[in-house]
């Protein structure tokens, strides 16, 4: 397999994985954007909307809408950040329970998928993705 074919497979797999996350979110009765916002907040309590939009490639207005809805449902609270414009997002107790209820089964699926391929293959995926991402980032920023 040549480099072009390898890259096409990498891109196809990334897109398919995103599609599967969309499918799971829909099955759980929420949007992909809501699920990814919950996921981001689970990984980094106190994350800002800006960090979610940049790190998770979600539209700014969409993240704002999701956060406002989660706030309306009393699942999150906002606290002042370093500057007054940016608010840090935290789960409330009921929000943490909601996120665990929604994300817990997803985490179990992810874990079972990794177990199915074995620890060596899982580590190879992690190592390969980290190396490819770093090399791709260098190429994208070369000369800029």
What are these regions (language model features)?
Residues 65:
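DNA-binding alpha-helical recognition surfaces that contact promoter or target DNA
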Residues 28, 55, 71-75, 116, ...:
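Residue cluster at the C-terminal edge of the helix-turn-helix DNA-binding motif
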Residues 1-8, 32, 47, 57-61, ...:
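Residues at secondary-structure transition points
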Residues 1-28, 97:
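N-terminal leader segment of winged-helix/HTH proteins
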Residues 1, 119-144:
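C-terminal regulatory/oligomerization modules of transcriptional regulators
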Residues 19-62:
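N-terminal helix-turn-helix DNA-binding core of bacterial DNA-binding proteins
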Residues 68-127:
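Charged, amphipathic alpha-helical coiled-coil/dimerization segments
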């Amino acid at each position: 397999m040549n480099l072009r074919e390898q890259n096409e497979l990498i891109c196809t797999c990334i897109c398919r994985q995103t599609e599967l996350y969309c499918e799971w979110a829909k099955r759980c009765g929420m949007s992909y954007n809501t699920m990814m916002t919950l996921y981001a907040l689970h990984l980094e309590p106190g994350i800002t909307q800006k960090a979610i939009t940049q790190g998770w490639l979600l539209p700014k207005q969409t993240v704002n809408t999701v956060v406002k809805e989660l706030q309306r449902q009393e699942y999150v609270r906002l606290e002042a950040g370093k500057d007054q414009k940016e608010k840090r997002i935290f789960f409330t107790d009921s929000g943490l329970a909601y996120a665990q209820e929604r994300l817990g089964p997803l985490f179990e699926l992810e874990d079972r998928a990794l177990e199915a391929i074995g620890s060596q293959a899982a580590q190879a995926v992690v190592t390969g993705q980290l190396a490819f991402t770093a090399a791709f980032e260098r190429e994208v920023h070369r000369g800029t």
